[in-house]
Amino acid sequence: MHDDSLRALAREIRVAVLTGAKRANVGHIGSALSIADIIAALYGRVLRIERPDDPDRDRFILSKGHAALAVYAALRARGWIDEETLSGYCTDATFAGTHPDHHLPGIDFSTGSLGQGLSFGTGAALAARLQGSGRRVFVLVSDAECNEGSVWESVMFAAHHRLSNLVAIVDANGQQALDHTHRVLDLSPLEARWAAFGWRAHLVDGHDLPELCGALSGDDSSAAPRVVLAQTVFGRGVSFMERAIKWHYMPMNDDEYRQALDQVNH
């Protein structure tokens, strides 16, 4: 997918996030908007995925599961789920819940409890090696999620086993549920911390699609896992949501939805 198509996909994801959240009257909007470009890069170019039932396709795990709506939009764009499933977001009508559900095609692990996705991803990467498969495993975590001790246990495990087929992506938007990450637990500089554990760390603009694609595709020749630290803006694309913590949980009213949709489409 060329750059213009990637930008169109990112816009489609943002529209779906806003529409789905408004229809269900739920929050987690800012978190999903911040990863829209990352998801577009993955599903539009980077991931080697043709069929959901291909045992050797790449795996993607959204560890920050509350942003699942962005992934559902990408799965719909690829034709892996239909519009009816996406429209049933956060209802009893489908498995498209607030957090990813492995009953949906393309969802490899049900997440929601933070800190678990990378643990699963390291196991999946090791399993691929033992099976002689060329599949890669990508895991998207949040910077606030790196407060969890289980993340660093996984980081040590992956480096020890030299899992070069594992790529972690950190959505570094600097915010979490109730405050800024540096105020809750300052982990800066994240790049140096991951590198100290033996990972190849790459710091990128999380909204620059060509830069994202280059870093995510990367070079698998080195026998070490990779981490892409994507500097993003919480609520990206909607001016009144950007860096505004209340949009972690806040649903939109009708006027806010119209304004947000207009900004994303223009």
Feature locations, PLM:
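Glycine/aspartate-rich loop-and-adjacent alpha/beta segment that forms the canonical ThDP
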Residues: 209, 214-266
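Cofactor-binding active-site loop characterized by glycine-rich and histidine/acidic residues
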Residues: 20, 33-160
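Thiamine diphosphate
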Residues: 106, 110-113, 117-220
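Generic beta-sheet signal
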Residues: 58-60, 135-139, 166, 222-232
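Structural motif
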Residues: 25-33
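Glycine-rich beta-alpha junction loops
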Residues: 66-67, 71, 173-174, 208, ...
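Non-catalytic, mobile gating and regulatory segments of ester bond hydrolases
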Residues: 1-5
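N-terminal capping segment at the start of a domain
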Residues: 9-26, 171-173
